[in-house]
Design a protein with these regions (language model features):
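Mid-domain Rossmann-like dinucleotide-binding core that forms the NAD(H)/NADP(H) cofactor-binding site
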Residues: 133-212
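Glycine-rich cofactor phosphate-binding loops and adjacent beta1-alpha1 units
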Residues: 154, 181, 197-274, 339-341
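N-terminal glycine-rich cofactor-binding segment
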Residues: 5-22, 37-68, 83, 97-112
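N-terminal Rossmann-fold cofactor-binding loop
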Residues: 189-192, 231, 279-280
């Protein structure tokens, strides 16, 4: 099978012919139907912080069709279309039993491979897609579930005043879930205006440029925000979120900054800010995302800009690394030879 393999830090992925993986206990082999690119793909191949394992076929926002079952599989069957969490665990520790293999300390393993023709999923951490959902929807489950994890950490109702810093997939996901949870005053902010319409389609009531926040934020929300979601992952933005939030408010850090951050802790202390961080998601987050899509809340489809083949994966990741892309979601369809669709 063909796959994009991480061979060298900071260098293009290598397109290679590698063996089709064989499913072990509780695992299923899936034929990948779609896989999305993510800023994590850049960060974890660049030598900054934690990296993917060298020699791994990467790609973690994937979905596909179950084509083979390993021993002891009881929850999936051949022909199921599934979105799989790109992690595996021991299956028996408290974290795994809670559907959180990301926190497993006994058997955590990365289950990547979405930028390839086949990959493995752990049946305990995979969710079936209903017939009405597309492969595009399936490959959006992972990032939108990640945003849900963060959105659930903040108290949100119809009276909440919400600020979202960053207009990428995480920012769009935060707007999406804030709206679904009843939020009505939702301001998204970023440095440029070109995503304003998209963020409003995702759930934001207003879009402000970053340099306008000081002047216009209170007018847009009525007062300082009760909740701030930091979704950009850019240096300095966590401090900006703490500065913006109301006294007694909540800041949730969804974006991951890999550079050191300088915070004036007395500012957060005097305001009695609740500061939360999120990592990954649970099976419940995956299922809730699939359920929301199945109810017709499919706005995240608008995040996907184009679909490419495996041949273009190395070049596209390098363009992302060099800041040459527009930031919209690009999906990979391993069944096409190349080119845009």
């Amino acid at each position: 099978m063909r796959a994009a393999v991480f061979r060298e830090v900071g260098q293009p992925l290598s397109l290679e012919d590698i063996p089709v993986p064989r499913p072990g206990a509780h695992q299923a082999l899936i034929k990948v139907g779609r896989c999305g690119f993510c800023a994590t793909d850049v960060a974890m191949t660049s030598g900054v912080g934690m990296n993917f394992p060298l020699g791994a076929a990467i790609g973690h926002e994937y979905c596909g069709e179950v084509v083979e079952l390993g021993p002891d599989v009881t929850r999936l069957k051949v022909g199921d279309i599934v979105a799989g969490m790109p992690e595996g665990g021991c299956g028996t520790c408290p974290a795994c039993l809670a559907g959180r293999p990301f926190d497993c300390f006994d058997g955590f393993t990365m289950m990547l491979g979405g930028f390839g023709e086949y990959t493995l999923v752990d049946e305990r951490f995979a969710v079936r897609l209903p017939a009405g959902l597309s492969l595009t929807d399936g490959a959006l489950v992972e990032p939108i579930a990640s945003a849900r994890r963060g959105a659930q950490m903040a108290p949100i109702d119809k009276d909440s005043r919400i600020l979202i810093l960053g207009a990428g997939a995480m920012g769009g996901g935060a707007a999406y879930w804030s709206r679904l949870r009843g939020g009505r005053k939702i301001v998204t902010s970023a440095r440029s205006a070109w995503r304003a319409d998209l963020m409003k389609e995702m759930g934001a009531s207003e879009y402000l440029l970053a340099h306008e926040l000081g002047e216009k934020l209170s007018g847009a929300l009525g007062s300082a925000p009760d909740v701030v979601f930091e979704c950009s992952g850019a240096p300095g933005m966590l401090a900006a979120a703490i500065d913006a939030v109301a006294v007694g408010g909540t800041v949730v850090c969804i974006g991951i900054c890999t550079s050191p951050e300088t915070l004036l802790l007395p500012q957060a202390s005097y305001k009695e800010v609740s500061l939360r961080f999120t990592a990954a998601y649970s099976v419940a987050d995956f299922q809730a995302t699939v359920d929301a899509f199945d109810r017709g809340a499919v706005e995240p489809r608008k995040l996907v800009d184009r679909i490419i083949g495996l041949d273009e994966v190395p070049d596209h990741l390098e363009n992302m690394r060099q800041g040459k892309t527009n930031g919209n979601k690009v999906h990979v369809d391993p069944t096409i030879a190349g080119g845009d669709h």
